[in-house]
């Protein structure tokens, strides 16, 4: 398990950076440390060692080796001080396409004023399943008896009333040896929306849904009722720091496998319907299934200080017709009041380094769960990282992409800087890749497509990412990717602008970086290609434990593919991994990559709406689950303490404009509050 990714600082600078000369930096930093995330490998490419905290000193390259002189004294970023890591479906929903089209035409990005949005969920109706269920009366009666059907303590009469309807809905399936089934349209009448497990006083939902806004998630479970007509009566409040245009609802079902028709029926239907085959497979392995979605349009650009009711007891029909929900949505603009650490409950430590801590926190007024990263100002100043720290905050505040971890708030105390980010708890892509060894073609394509959107959104803001690798990619609760760690980003890079800072991770360094030729945005397409190759084979294409040898391979070794490698993926990789940046796929814009045959079955508009069901869903029990984080950190007690580090007024002035609660810049002065050590 791995902890929240904490931004790493670059060792050394080039002439692009202000404040110190290269000689001064060389003297200050000496030989850097590279972070190696790959353990020793088996001959088949699968990981032998799952510990990715290996750190290797980079020796000075021998002048007799045939490598560029620019590599003789590499000025690299330092990872040593941070001990923590932080099947596309066939649904062609016209509603998804239409909403995505509307979203894609608005290029100005989200408005940035703060407020609170309250969502009240009352009930649901007309929920159905995509398959029939057994009509076995013993199984159905036992399941209903364990359910919470009404507000009364005794549901026996309700169970009896439901069971009396069974003959009316039972049918005989002539295609499966005369098995008695209940049609998919009526099956939910006989399934409770939640049940009480034996020996437990807590209910377990068989139907539930999530509400997602700006990567903040709330899970809504029913209080009572059948799956056909669940009763929720729940309220959830969201912090609004960006006025996004949609609120996303996803409905899930947790179907006991005993309810499924016979194995013969499942085999027969699976041969006819691949989608249903995958659904049945998930149920048989005790996985929740995704039933339906809805993108609720929002108009939060309201010039009013009063609370506005956006929807009043409004029935929404889910996009694929599997049910309806009754909701009310209110929005209240709020005054731009700067936050402090006292506005949060500290729940868990999820990361730690010499700079401070990363903690799971709960915002007291909305009860929303976030990741709070605390950066010690004295450490940042001592490492000459003020510019890059401010750049990271700027990128996070400006970016508008569903596949990038968004900044919710930032504030400061006299001793610290704080970033409050969406809490993404599905684990690092690195961990999942180590566990699997390699990914399937469909799974690799899905992740690369979402990453392509993330990088494109950064490039449109004239930002180069420069550090794409599995450790910097998180999975959310559904399995969508979330790019994080923007400590090596370079801002204000137009299409043809070049920079020459030597930074990154060895396995992913592009040839133009090694050659010291300067590089443009196309360096990100090289790293995207390296990552795709690693996903599909288990190792980067030029990997070697000996760093100088690996550099030689990056510059000289032909790109090799295993037998049976997908032809479209091979062609894409040849384009992305062109050593000549001027001929690299993507040099003329992201559409060059999007239009490649490798992505021919992907609707990019649907993808941006998170309209595809991810090929893998991480094991996440709830929005506060920290099981995918390193227990070395989560077992620590979160402590709010004072840091005694005095900084002069001139140094404090460097952190002016750090505060963010919905506006790009709201405050220049550090608040007088407690800080986290």
UniProtKB/Swiss-Prot annotation:
Q: Which residues bind ATP?
A: 350-358, 373
Q: Where is this region: Disordered?
A: 1-115
> What does its PTM field state?
Autophosphorylated. Phosphorylated by PKH2 and TOR2.
Ranges where the AGC-kinase C-terminal domain occurs: 600-670
Task: Look up the EC number in the record and give it.
Answer: 2.7.11.1
Q: Does the keyword Mitochondrion apply?
A: no
Modification sites for Phosphothreonine: 63, 66, 499, 501, 659
**Which is an annotated GO molecular function term of this record?**
protein serine/threonine kinase activity
Query: Mind telling me what this protein is named?
Result: Serine/threonine-protein kinase YPK2/YKR2
